From Swiss-Prot:
Its main location: cytoplasm. It catalyses: N-acetyl-L-glutamate 5-semialdehyde + phosphate + NADP(+) = N-acetyl-L-glutamyl 5-phosphate + NADPH + H(+). It comes from Methanocella arvoryzae (strain DSM 22066 / NBRC 105507 / MRE50). The lineage of its organism: Archaea, Methanobacteriati, Methanobacteriota, Stenosarchaea group, Methanomicrobia. Pathway: Amino-acid biosynthesis; L-arginine biosynthesis; N(2)-acetyl-L-ornithine from L-glutamate: step 3/4. This is N-acetyl-gamma-glutamyl-phosphate reductase. The keyword Cytoplasm applies.
Amino acid sequence: MLKIGIVGGTGYTGGELLRLLSIHPLAEVTVVTSRKQAGQPVDTVHPNLKSLTDLKFEDPDPAKIAERCDVVFTAVPHGAAMAVVPELLKYGLRVIDLSADYRLPTEKFEQVYNKKHLDPREAVYGLPELHPEVKDATLIANPGCYPTGANLACAPLIAQGLVNRAVVDSKSGISGSGQDPTEGTHYPNVTQNVRPYNLTTHRHKAEIEQEMLRLNNSTRIHFTPHVIPSTRGIMTTAHLFVDEPLTTDQVQTIYDEFYKNKPFVRLQKPSLANVRGSNFCDIAFEVEKDSDRIVVVSAIDNMVKGASGQAIQNMNLMYGFDERTGLWTSGLSP
């Protein structure tokens, strides 16, 4: 049985890791940490886990974690992981980091997040549909939620060198903003409303550009996010402008081939309800007649495929498990 530690278990992503791993047949959580909640039962913070775990939060001590774990998920705020990851790696642990600390090159990270990086090192970007090398990784940088939906929508056509410009519009549920309440997540400001924000400057744009330019360095990327009155889910609409007209059959073939043997990508009409609670990404497209535009839409659960589920998918691949293990479940439709 694979032994797992979770550093930072009180937030949404930590709670989702605990929920999903509670039914994983080949892994068990042996350590979950929180400085503020040390000594408290996990279910006092995550009451949905009552009767599913007897764990208590502990202070984060890398040496003690290493004695009881094989792999560690770090689910801490941006800027905090870089302080703990080096210690975990020093003890021979494999690490899957759910923060942004290792997703970008050091200089780009410092520019985008306005923080000095304390631990410049390379990690494998953990989008397994694009990075099969996750299976051999010691440190995985789990992708952001917006980039997951955007990159999976855009990658097949961009990888073919067919797209000169991509205009990406994403709409996310409120949980993507994290657990701490803000003016932007306050119920009266969210309900019956759609709130665009960081129209041209959202920090996840850097991840989308990084991955798509790796596939084709001449594609221009534009990205704008919105918050919608939903707890979970991201619906992404990508307007892809191509150099030469393509038929529907041609595009279908490209997507079929690209995602062949990628079990968590389903080519069907996207719906947030159909992916909620699951690790699936549903994708569909439409070719605009007499135009250079192809519209691709993707749907994911931002807490699962956009965060904790994808992290477990990466873990499965790292340890030679079927990537579906513990994750092969439908969305909660309706």
